[in-house]
């Protein structure tokens, strides 16, 4: 299987998982996923695939289905991609700064994808302002602190 075919498979899996999901501003969530993937595409295949899959585990409900997604990612893309996707997947009840970002920072692929994810979130936060100014301000502070934390 070629690298392009693997990238296409990753995008297909992300589309299946995210389905009709929308972001907080009401835009199709896959727009965010593909924007993050595009922003890291020059870093290489692994970064692009992880970007496409970066929210698949976290956004899969119910929990039982997460095991299937994890298995599909490991079987399809191997341990390097799997480890990065797991590292970038926030766990329920996990502290964002004390636990999650520390784990992300330990995986070079997850780190670069998360930085791109945060930057994309900051760029697109304007869509929230008309819907929920308070939430947009909270997220802006959170993302800026996360960028500082990750370096």
Q: For each predicted feature, which ranges?
A:
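Active-site helical microenvironments for divalent-metal-assisted chemistry
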Residues: 1-151
